[in-house]
């Protein structure tokens, strides 16, 4: 036997085997699915909490003429209020909307009111509160003013919800003898004792307040023990607002 030839053949066979072994592709290692702990949670939407809502019936000359609704929500450290006010006067609609934003203690940060506050009268005003100043809008005109130490945003007797919030603010901020109002004016809020009224066969006691400065004359408001406005009377306008 020719051993030299056999060795050469063996070398060729081994070389071929090695080449075939190293030519085999590596198997793909399956990727491990991320666990629930390693998966990033989607960002959560801001939590908006519904705090309060209510409805008032509007009366003029002791006749039902419309209604006012409001909703208060909390978003973090802020409160937002949306108000719809609408009544009918001599066959014509008188719609009014207002939005209000504040800190949780009712310190105002923004206010806007737009629509009709009487059959022949319109309003379009806004207030934006900054750290040291306030921006006031009357229709298309903006002006700046110094920020008062204590104040509330309101523009007239309507909507009644804003009067309710103003009394709450006043009562929780030292009950000042006078309170500045924006976009303009000052009001005087005074407690006037309590009245007991029969409601659904039982007696209920309400706190009575008066407000001067929003409209000619003096308004009277009644609140329950939870600081909810129950009734508002505006004698100069012959208007009464009653919670439903």
Task: List the model feature ranges, each with a label.
Residues 59-138, 225, 232:
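N-terminal mature ectodomain segment of secretory-pathway/periplasmic proteins
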Residues 82, 86, 95, 99-101, ...:
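Gly/Pro-enriched, hydrophobic low-complexity segments
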Residues 67, 95, 161-166, 218-220:
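Transmembrane beta-barrel architecture of outer membranes
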Residues 23-36:
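Signal peptide processing junction and immediate N-terminal pro/mature segment
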Residues 34-69:
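Hydrophobic, proline/glycine-rich low-complexity stretches
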Residues 12-24:
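Bacterial N-terminal signal peptides
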Residues 49-51, 65, 117-210, 226, ...:
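Solvent-exposed helix/loop surface patches that form functional interfaces
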Residues 2-14:
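Bacterial N-terminal signal peptides that target proteins for export
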């Amino acid at each position: 036997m020719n051993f030299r030839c056999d060795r050469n053949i063996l070398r060729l066979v081994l070389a071929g085997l090695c080449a075939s072994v190293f030519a085999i592709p590596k198997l793909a290692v399956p990727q491990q699915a991320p666990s629930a702990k390693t998966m990033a949670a989607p960002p959560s939407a801001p939590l908006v909490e519904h705090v309060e809502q209510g409805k008032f019936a509007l009366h003029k000359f002791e006749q039902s003429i419309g209604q006012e609704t409001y909703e208060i929500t909390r978003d973090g450290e802020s409160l937002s209020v949306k108000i719809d006010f609408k009544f009918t006067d001599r066959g014509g609609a008188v719609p009014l909307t207002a939005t209000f934003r504040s800190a949780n203690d009712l310190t105002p940060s923004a206010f806007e009111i737009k629509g009709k506050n009487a059959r022949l009268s319109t309003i379009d005003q806004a207030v934006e509160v900054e750290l040291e100043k306030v921006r006031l809008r009357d229709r298309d005109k903006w002006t700046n003013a110094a920020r008062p130490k204590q104040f509330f945003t309101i523009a007239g007797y309507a909507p009644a919800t804003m009067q309710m919030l103003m009394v709450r603010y006043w009562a929780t901020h030292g009950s000042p003898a006078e309170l500045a109002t924006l976009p303009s004016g000052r009001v005087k809020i005074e407690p006037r004792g309590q009245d007991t009224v029969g409601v659904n066969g039982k007696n209920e006691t309400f706190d009575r307040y008066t407000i001067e400065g929003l409209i000619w004359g003096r308004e009277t408001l009644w609140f329950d023990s939870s600081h909810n406005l129950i009734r508002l009377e505006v004698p100069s306008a012959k208007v009464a607002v009653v919670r439903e």
